Amino acid sequence: MSNEFLLNAESRSDTGKGASRRLRRLQERVPGILYGGEAEPQMISVELRELKKALENEAFYSHILTLKLDGADVQAVLRDMQRHPAKGHPLHVDLLRVDKTHKITMSVPLHFTNEESSIGVKKQGGEIQHNFAEVEVSCLPQHLPEFIEVDMANAELDSVVHLSDLKLPKGVELTQLALGEDHDQPVAAVHQPKVRASSDDDDAAEGEEAASEE
């Protein structure tokens, strides 16, 4: 994990919708909750500007974060976030404490590479279809990957890449595969592009339809 994310957090005692609105409007901070582990859930807030900057990086969503909270460093991951329905800015965050000795389950994005140069596309004229943009993994916090690469270079026409075909970092497991072979779902496939009807065919069809109506 090459990226490092640090958020300055503060404890808060005021709760409720009114308190949250004041926090966002007057202090430009985002309310949240920190839970998990052996400690009790804790109401917190983080700086809006700092959080928005971190959210611009895809890795933030699947990364161990460091919270500076009450003079201590707390390791956590983003579990959930509420956004404004129209403006899109964060309204509330749920953060889960992590312990380096306990596995966590997280969704990690897939990065598809070598698509245009793949055998099925470049040499055989196919198109690549994605079935998933992310997968759920289970691992120790220190093994959590920012993303999983799906190399399509050798994918031929009519071939399918399944979950079991993904190359995973050491110590990382796919939760779906742990459920059995029936859950080995297709991640991507190379197929023939759909043929669109030509304008001549469309004109002919319209002519036949018009003739049938006369």
Curated annotation (Swiss-Prot):
The keyword Ribosomal protein applies. The keyword Cell division does not apply. Pfam families: Ribosomal_L25p, Ribosomal_TL5_C. One of its GO terms (biological process) is translation. GO terms for cellular component: cytosolic large ribosomal subunit. Gene3D superfamilies: Ribosomal protein L25, beta domain (2.170.120.20), Ribosomal Protein L25, Chain P (2.40.240.10). One of its GO terms (molecular function) is structural constituent of ribosome. It comes from the Bacteria. Residues 200-214 have a biased composition (Acidic residues). This is one of the proteins that binds to the 5S RNA in the ribosome where it forms part of the central protuberance. Belongs to the bacterial ribosomal protein bL25 family. CTC subfamily. This is Large ribosomal subunit protein bL25.
